[in-house]
Amino acid sequence: NERIMAQKIIGRKQEIKELLDLYKENKPVFAVIYGRRRVGKTFLVRELFQDKMSFYHTGLSPYELSGQKIMEQQLTSFYSSLVRYGSKGKKVPSSWLEAFDALINLLEEQDADKRQVIFIDELPWLDTPRSGFVTALEHFWNGWAAGKQNIMLIVCGSATSWISDKLLNNKGGLFDRTT
């Protein structure tokens, strides 16, 4: 089945191998995929893990959102993704800490014996000014996910400077946590 999936993806043998190797590891994985827009990052992850996703969300483009309500719109969209994957939460989270707590609740209701793939696409778009997004992501990873052998968190984005500054070169809670 993995071979059939990989055949649909042309010219990405190394990336496919790396992602499948990470998937097979018996430890928590925080994988960061970044690069220019429209080069197939999202397609690669969705094709490889489409039947293994425990949660998938794509950030809303801030260029098309209006004014002060950007964070609220991002949280509403994240909540919709939680519900789509079976969350029983009754209200839209009012903060990213609440949103990631709702994600933890969703994942804890799922089969803990199988690898849980969490894919957050266009991650930089979720980090609006004063939203506390990076702090909440750090809390999710360090406070919960990093202690779960079955978690594979894949984040993706085309804002390479944001990815580099906030994740790969992070000197805070995500320092040296990413693959």
Sequence positions of predicted segments:
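Phosphate-binding site recognition
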Residues: N1-T179
